[in-house]
């Protein structure tokens, strides 16, 4: 563990990987084709890339399984990056996330009509059980203001290549109708006092910064103090909202 700086203190510390762990040996890294197959899982019947998965040696380490599920922004971006190798994944992710698209207002899960979820887990998932019990969450969890924006952009990219996919029905609703619901969500969020999409969590125990940089210390004021509260608008989200509306 590195030495602490002046004013810092250790609040929690645990060793996850020891020196000599197989994961630290470059020779044990899988080939790209193998790695792609490793991250593929199933969500509501669709084959999708999970945000991250542990190596075989780490299957029983809880911390290594934190992202072994369908994540809104992560799975969308991964499927786009892997389009050349697995072009089927992008539409799969779009449909899988659409099947969980928000229908009602639920402050606990932060679900809102038209919103694409941040994190989708089965009820028996150990991480879901822990976050539900200790964090006051509910799954699917919708605490993300950029997943819907990225979903719109990826749908546009897929439709440019194959316009007919807009008629694809997910749970009885076509993707183009779902894009209208997503657009309504975006316009509603843009009606904030700043005219920008802000985090504004509904669950006080939910994620504070509901964007790519979602750590609690990701945003600061000019004087260096942490930007706490729920009215932070990231510059990335401004650009993503612009792209989504153009889509």
Regions found by a protein language model. Name each.
Residues 1-247:
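Acidic, mature catalytic/reactive cores of soluble proteins
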